[in-house]
């Protein structure tokens, strides 16, 4: 499973709804992620440029996109951004692979 970090913002509509009816947003989002075969690992309310951060697992990016489309179409979130995250072990494997192919590249100039 691939790991994805998703950030976004709540719309005014969402904030009004949360004030009127407080809810556990992780519990609300988890079934959506599960519906595409993924798993919600963590959900955080954040300060700064974004209002929330989620860490999810899914087979690949094509699997997580439908969940993001549904959330975005709800009108309660905006500015959704998704990045694929790699473990330290995965990144080490990439470094070793790069070392093995480095001689194949000829830089410009």
Regions found by a protein language model. Give the residues of each.
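A compositional/biophysical signature of low hydrophobicity enriched in polar/charged and small residues
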Residues: 1-109
